């Protein structure tokens, strides 16, 4: 009976919801793109005091890259391989020690292949990842990545973030036209509205300037330069508490594990042949103190009882060992100020909740888009013309970026427990929907993995989950209370996803062909406008 209702009611309800959504947002939400340039009030750049800067000589680079993390290193190698002179300035060239940026989705691995840097996941004891396992109240389901149509080498990868970054830095520095320097960038140099380079302190503490036709800021989630180039609206919905479980046998080998715990999810995935990363999400911006032992007590009394029994002992041992780290989870929609001579990339530009491990996939996909836009250009010195042309970047990146961003931020809200009964019904419906198999499983997983970055498909599945939850409530008897709860479930689902979509940009996300910048062509030398 439930199956028959599903087959008849679901398509009708989804269609009506989507029509309402497209009609309302397509006609009544004004695109945020207009006026971005005019909203630019406070600029933290400094005006160059060196007079007129000639950036056509041999003493300057074509591109300055600020930051040599995942985005900066990959970008430096990519542009260097295209014969650009690249100057990379990184605050600290020692191996990073982070608790995020350790899971690369299959879609991100495809971008590594496209950029020619797939060898950077070799020789670092990286582990292949073939899907996810979800756990909730004693139930468990396995979600496999839909990899059948891809080469056998294509899968997710998990690793120590620092090892991966060091491999990419070495790859970039191996090119003779890429200069990798340790230094702290203090500010951008601006002359007549165009960014001409940066002011920085080198490793010896000496203040210097560097000039280039294009400066790309990739200085990460703590960026101190982004305010010059975008309108940062950073939210911190939660914090991750990270541990390393040693010699731990996960219930499903070579899979990411998500425990739908109370109050919020727990993640686990292998980062080497002997280590498993465990990330405990703590809602809000304040976490129990690690120093006075509150955190250990929280992990043992609240978190440990909800862990799968296979990892319980390893989890307790990791807590007792005491190597516990925490970091805030940031989310920030891309809201750029198109600026001649400069561009933002990576976490400095756009962030989403790290629940789905999509950050590196977005960054690498952005680099592919930017590389393809810059390849036809021999000369980058016309800042105004280049800036106009690169406005297309913000639209062309949307299919991948908006899909992964929206899914990550929406899924986090769905996966957290709540005192709201309708929200908890949505959580239950999502877990059971993913376990139905067929398109109900492969569709969402292909979105999460970055293999099928289609925003409309994401919206369809999101509301399919909501409608599935309503159908469950109405069977076997649709009492007034259950009908009201179903209405609140649909309303709650809309309240989750619509604000995220609005922040991403409805027009660019669903109707990119209506954005003029979508059609911009590469300018020729001397042009001031893009056709």
Swiss-Prot record:
<keyword id="KW-0812">Transmembrane</keyword>
<feature type="transmembrane region" description="Helical">
    <location>
        <begin position="9"/>
        <end position="29"/>
    </location>
</feature>
<dbReference type="GO" id="GO:0050660">
    <property type="term" value="F:flavin adenine dinucleotide binding"/>
</dbReference>
<feature type="transmembrane region" description="Helical">
    <location>
        <begin position="483"/>
        <end position="503"/>
    </location>
</feature>
<keyword id="KW-0285">Flavoprotein</keyword>
<dbReference type="Pfam" id="PF13450">
    <property type="entry name" value="NAD_binding_8"/>
</dbReference>
<feature type="binding site">
    <location>
        <position position="185"/>
    </location>
    <ligand>
        <name>FAD</name>
    </ligand>
</feature>
<comment type="function">
    <text>Catalyzes the stereospecific oxidation of squalene to (S)-2,3-epoxysqualene, and is considered to be a rate-limiting enzyme in steroid biosynthesis. Can produce not only oxidosqualene, but also 2,3:22,23-dioxidosqualene. Main squalene epoxidase in the root. Sqe1 mutants may show defects in membrane lipid rafts, impairing the correct localization of RHD2 NADPH oxidase and the proper polarized production of ROS.</text>
</comment>
<keyword id="KW-1133">Transmembrane helix</keyword>
<dbReference type="GO" id="GO:0004506">
    <property type="term" value="F:squalene monooxygenase activity"/>
</dbReference>
<feature type="binding site">
    <location>
        <position position="169"/>
    </location>
    <ligand>
        <name>FAD</name>
    </ligand>
</feature>
<keyword id="KW-0274">FAD</keyword>
<feature type="binding site">
    <location>
        <position position="98"/>
    </location>
    <ligand>
        <name>FAD</name>
    </ligand>
</feature>
<feature type="binding site">
    <location>
        <position position="347"/>
    </location>
    <ligand>
        <name>FAD</name>
    </ligand>
</feature>
<dbReference type="InterPro" id="IPR013698">
    <property type="entry name" value="Squalene_epoxidase"/>
</dbReference>
<keyword id="KW-0560">Oxidoreductase</keyword>
<dbReference type="Pfam" id="PF08491">
    <property type="entry name" value="SE"/>
</dbReference>
<protein>
    <recommendedName>
        <fullName>Squalene epoxidase 1</fullName>
        <ecNumber>1.14.14.17</ecNumber>
    </recommendedName>
</protein>
<comment type="pathway">
    <text>Terpene metabolism; lanosterol biosynthesis; lanosterol from farnesyl diphosphate: step 2/3.</text>
</comment>
<dbReference type="GO" id="GO:0016126">
    <property type="term" value="P:sterol biosynthetic process"/>
</dbReference>
<keyword id="KW-0472">Membrane</keyword>
<feature type="transmembrane region" description="Helical">
    <location>
        <begin position="458"/>
        <end position="478"/>
    </location>
</feature>
<comment type="similarity">
    <text>Belongs to the squalene monooxygenase family.</text>
</comment>
<feature type="site" description="Important for enzyme activity">
    <location>
        <position position="132"/>
    </location>
</feature>
<dbReference type="GO" id="GO:0009723">
    <property type="term" value="P:response to ethylene"/>
</dbReference>
<dbReference type="InterPro" id="IPR040125">
    <property type="entry name" value="Squalene_monox"/>
</dbReference>
<feature type="binding site">
    <location>
        <position position="360"/>
    </location>
    <ligand>
        <name>FAD</name>
    </ligand>
</feature>
<dbReference type="InterPro" id="IPR036188">
    <property type="entry name" value="FAD/NAD-bd_sf"/>
</dbReference>
<feature type="binding site">
    <location>
        <begin position="70"/>
        <end position="71"/>
    </location>
    <ligand>
        <name>FAD</name>
    </ligand>
</feature>
<dbReference type="GO" id="GO:0016020">
    <property type="term" value="C:membrane"/>
</dbReference>
<feature type="binding site">
    <location>
        <begin position="90"/>
        <end position="91"/>
    </location>
    <ligand>
        <name>FAD</name>
    </ligand>
</feature>
<dbReference type="GO" id="GO:0009414">
    <property type="term" value="P:response to water deprivation"/>
</dbReference>
